[in-house]
């Protein structure tokens, strides 16, 4: 197959950041994706309906002229979140609340420290129809970073899912066979997103031959057996798994430092890279479901009506992109060849 047309896709997990960065990140995503779930981990975090609505307006202001791109907003759960916050968020059009264990990722220090105390909030979310998006890692300092996802399932996620069967839960950016198996065996209210980097890479691509800071993300890349498990589940076409890039921009100097930031900025190549993965797996017929159907169906939103055409044509991801402030950012797969390309009119 040398050409593939799919329903216009959505990105069910990304980071736009804020301020001048929006002039880069919003157009990069809006070129192909009609909607995106926008993460709330700003400084300060987006913890309520008012902050979410204001952030949404800043994103809309950064859309390219004529764009119909729609940001889908989320709020950031803390131990101070109330049921009224959930009610107000739902009324304001917020679609989900994000659970970050404190310290799990960029700007998550304000997040949840006593997870069991949030069970009344999960009950409110179940009642009012707000989805729960989970960064599924434990964060105690003595626990090995490669074990944190599996332990989160065991300690917390299984209990949350069992306690709230009417609560839709998205296990975001899964990285392990443990997570894939958990989602596959869970009830229909549980789904997962998978990033391009976790399908394309494993921890050797981060650590062998020198540290590769632009492949560093959280949850961290795992061993190849976990990568292969993720590739296997997307190849099945299961509706429980859908596209979430976790595109997460950081300026070049913040990645290439003694204490580099976590995140891969994949917005400019994500769909094409997913196509490459599905092609490698002999499963191109499953790409449309993963990119364009399973996500809206799980969220209870209409599927998009437009289409995107990909052609089998090699191109090279730019080595750098210059941000509006003049600083460079290195995109994911910078300088690498990609075998699929979006066809432009």
Curated annotation (Swiss-Prot):
Binds 2 Zn(2+) ions per subunit. PROSITE patterns: DIHYDROOROTASE_1, DIHYDROOROTASE_2. Pathway: Pyrimidine metabolism; UMP biosynthesis via de novo pathway; (S)-dihydroorotate from bicarbonate: step 3/3. Its cofactor is Zn(2+). The modification N6-carboxylysine is found at residue 98. One of its GO terms (molecular function) is dihydroorotase activity. Keywords: Hydrolase, Metal-binding, Pyrimidine biosynthesis, Zinc. One of its GO terms (biological process) is 'de novo' UMP biosynthetic process. It catalyses: (S)-dihydroorotate + H2O = N-carbamoyl-L-aspartate + H(+). Pfam families: Amidohydro_1. Substrate binds at residues 15-17, 41, 135, 218, 250, 262. Its EC number is 3.5.2.3. Zn(2+) 2 binds at residues 98, 135, 173. GO terms for cellular component: cytosol. Catalyzes the reversible cyclization of carbamoyl aspartate to dihydroorotate. HAMAP family: PyrC_classII (MF_00219). PANTHER family: DIHYDROOROTASE (PTHR43137:SF1). Belongs to the metallo-dependent hydrolases superfamily. DHOase family. Class II DHOase subfamily. Homodimer. This is Dihydroorotase. The lineage of its organism: Bacteria, Pseudomonadati, Pseudomonadota, Gammaproteobacteria, Alteromonadales.
